[in-house]
Swiss-Prot record:
GO terms for biological process: bacterial-type flagellum-dependent swarming motility; positive chemotaxis. Gene3D superfamilies: CheC-like (3.40.1550.10), SpoA-like (2.30.330.10). Pfam families: FliM, FliMN_C. This is Flagellar motor switch protein FliM. Its main location: membrane. GO terms for cellular component: bacterial-type flagellum basal body; plasma membrane. The keyword Phosphoprotein does not apply. It is found in: Cell inner membrane; Bacterial flagellum basal body. GO terms for molecular function: cytoskeletal motor activity. NCBIfam families: fliM_switch (TIGR01397). Interacts (via N-terminus) with unphosphorylated CheY. Interacts (via central domain) with FliG (via central domain or via central domain and C-terminus). Belongs to the FliM family. FliM is one of three proteins (FliG, FliN, FliM) that forms the rotor-mounted switch complex (C ring), located at the base of the basal body. This complex interacts with the CheY and CheX chemotaxis proteins, in addition to contacting components of the motor that determine the direction of flagellar rotation.
């Protein structure tokens, strides 16, 4: 297309400038953006946009499966957000905290190794909750052999989820080669090799941490032909998608949730709270014959009547809350 404007186009441009619909700075900025396109020779792009998009889809599937798995293990809803970046192996190693939980793994069809790295705050919080603790105040020290052995099994399960997410492109059986806590001792590829870094932001409540998966280019290069939207669409059979959705539905039904029967609530002044003693009676705004509120994960869900069942306190569900706060 020619860069020369017609007289009519010139008149329209001048009219837009006079009316303030278009600013001169915008034209200059647009022209400047067209002239210069930065390129980092130290970090050349090894992957096409299509391959990166497919890689993102693979690991978003992994993120959803990881969210379901962690929600079951930690007994609360865990949100997992996936992001992907391209950088050198040296830059990745420098970004890893010391100490950290670094798992070097491979697959039966891979030529080379990859890295699964978990931040220690997540490592110790998850370990403590699995062992029956509250998961608070994680220490900042290298894990012991016993702690490593327990969490190694958890990472093995997570790597299995990762392999399942890859199965539409390349089925592989993951295996752990080694575990380290100091990134300076981990050298799986040359420092200047390009790697794809998959970062999973793991959060629940006020807690947030990260899991990183580092894929070296040399390991992925033989698979690049399969990393395309076309291949992905051809490999996705409707019955297979439905089968996986059913698996996710079944897995989600096993996630434990907290159910609370709220007998009543009231408001007290700070002085009244400070003056409370053993034996004091606090009046609630609920009559003993009234229905009580039943919360699921802190949100009103049902109404019920308290009572006793087989020698234990219980509550009978009598109605359900609607979106407006009323109940049926």
């Amino acid at each position: 297309m020619s860069d020369v404007l017609s007289q009519e186009e010139i008149n329209q441009l001048i009219e837009a400038l006079m009316k303030g619909e278009l600013k001169e700075e915008d034209l200059l900025k647009e022209e400047e953006e067209k002239k210069v396109k930065p390129y980092d020779f130290k970090r050349p792009s090894k992957f096409s946009k299509e391959q990166l998009r497919t890689f993102q889809m693979i690991h978003e599937n992994f993120g959803r499966a990881l969210s379901t798995y962690l929600s079951g293990r930690l007994r609360t809803f865990v949100d997992v957000e996936i992001s992907i970046d391209q950088l050198t192996y040296e830059e990745f190693i420098r970004s890893v905290m010391i100490p950290s939980f670094i798992v070097i793994f491979t697959g039966d069809v891979f030529e080379g190794s990859a890295i699964f790295e978990m931040r220690l705050d997540l490592f110790y919080t998850m370990l403590d909750i699995i062992m029956g603790g509250p998961g608070e105040n994680p220490p900042n020290r290298p894990p012991t052999e016993i702690e490593t052995s327990i969490m190694r099994k958890e990472v093995t399960n997570m790597l299995t989820l990762l392999a399942q997410a890859w199965s539409d492109f390349q089925y592989f059986i993951p295996s752990i080669e080694n575990v380290e806590t100091n990134p300076q001792f981990v050298q799986i590829v040359p420092p200047n090799e390009i790697v794809l870094l998959v970062t999973a932001s793991v959060s629940w409540g006020e807690f947030t941490s990260f899991i990183n998966v580092c894929w070296p280019f040399s390991l992925l290069e033989p698979l690049l032909e399969k990393l395309s939207d076309r291949f992905w669409m051809m490999g996705r059979k409707p019955e297979k998608v439905e089968e996986r959705m059913e698996e996710l539905r079944k897995a989600s039904q096993k996630i434990p949730v907290t159910v609370q029967a709220v007998i009543g609530e009231t408001e007290l002044r700070l002085k009244e709270i400070l003056d409370l003693e053993v034996g004091d009676v606090i009046r609630l705004g609920t009559h003993y014959k009234d229905e009580i509120r039943i919360d699921v994960e802190g949100r009103p869900k049902f109404r019920g009547i308290p009572g006793v069942f087989k020698g234990k306190y219980a509550v009978k569900v009598t109605g359900e809350f609607t979106n407006g706060g009323e109940y049926e």
